[in-house]
Regions:
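Positively charged, low-complexity intrinsically disordered leader regions
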Residues: 1-14
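A short, flexible beta-alpha/helix-coil linker loop
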Residues: 9-12, 149, 174-176, 231-232
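Glycine-rich phosphate/pyrophosphate-binding beta-alpha loops
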Residues: 21, 73, 94, 117-119, ...
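Short, conserved phosphate/pyrophosphate- and ester-handling motifs at nucleotide-, phospho-/glycolipid
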Residues: 30, 171, 240
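Conserved phosphate-binding/catalytic region of the ribokinase-like
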Residues: 186-296
């Protein structure tokens, strides 16, 4: 069983609102790739909260959603000269996830737990999630998908979560930021990933570089690098989360590093061809990698 901990929210787009949140996206794609799972979050006792609970159910996402007196999470998206600017509203329901016996019981059963920096930006949810992660069973995957957003992070938080994690995922822009933050100089991207692997005793470090490539290094010395296949992009919402969810589900079901990596790349490419982070899956996800390789 796979769990995610953190934000559940509405993106308030100029065209209307869209349900999302990286941890919930992660569960959606884990479940579509062979895992059972739950998203754990909180929404307000308000109309937006009612609608968000309904949206997760309609998408087939199993979730343990606390209700509290804080407003349901939103992200205000404004277009400035055609470029979206995001304001992740503070002081919302998912900033106040309560530490409960029900959540402890779920975490104790989990084979993998996913979390990121945003879901721990507030003291209450930070303390809840950190305490819950202490209850994972031996050998459970603790997947830290850094997902840096705005100024909702600190070096102290990233270091704390790296010490908790067994898997660390970041993108090329986040690696640039972390090189400066951790004073990692004069090394290749692969060497920088291995620095995190060794410094924090991780099982895997995953680096994604958008439309270019992705690479995974492991504590066994095995690694996998895959060029990103070219697809007609509708939007990239949830693509990184779909990569994480697919990789986790495949590894838990016994896939090799290379098999899990290729599956994750294909799913992320598929998600980019669709609108939104919770697309309807086809019977079989296209093998974009095999197609690209056959055309070389």
């Amino acid at each position: 069983m796979v769990l995610s901990l953190g934000e559940l929210l509405w993106d308030m787009l100029p065209s209307g609102k869209r349900a999302g949140g990286a941890p919930v996206n992660f569960i959606y794609h884990s479940v579509h790739n062979g895992a059972d799972g739950y998203a754990i979050s909180a929404v307000g006792e308000d109309e937006l909260g009612d609608e968000l609970v309904a949206a997760t159910k309609n998408a087939g996402i199993n979730a343990i959603i606390q209700r509290n007196a804080w407003p349901t999470g939103t992200v205000d998206v404004q277009l400035k000269n055609g470029i979206p600017e995001y304001t992740i509203v503070r002081g919302v329901a998912w900033d106040h996830i309560l530490y409960t016996r029900q959540l402890i019981n779920e975490v104790e059963k989990a084979d993998a737990v996913c979390f990121g920096t945003l879901g721990l930006r507030s003291p209450e949810s930070h303390d809840t999630i950190i305490e819950l992660l202490k209850h994972t069973k031996p050998g459970a995957m603790k997947f830290f998908d850094i997902n840096i957003r705005g100024d909702h992070y600190s070096k102290e938080l990233i270091d704390e979560l790296l010490r908790t994690a067994t898997v660390f995922k970041l993108n090329d822009a986040e690696l640039l930021l972390l090189r400066d933050m951790f004073n990692i100089r004069g090394t290749s991207d692969d060497e920088a990933c291995r620095w995190f692997l060794n410094e924090y005793g991780l099982d895997y470090v995953i680096l994604t570089a958008g439309s270019t490539f992705s690479t995974i290094v492991s504590k066994t010395g095995e690694s996998s690098t895959v060029d990103t296949p070219h697809v007609e992009v509708e939007d990239t919402v949830g693509a990184g989360d779909s990569f994480s969810g697919t990789f986790t589900a495949k590894i838990l079901n016994g896939a090799s590093l290379t098999e899990a990596h290729r599956a994750a790349v294909n799913v992320a490419a598929f998600v980019c061809t669709q609108s939104g982070g919770w697309p309807t899956y086809p019977d079989v996800v296209p093998d974009y990698l095999a197609e690209a390789e056959s055309n070389k």
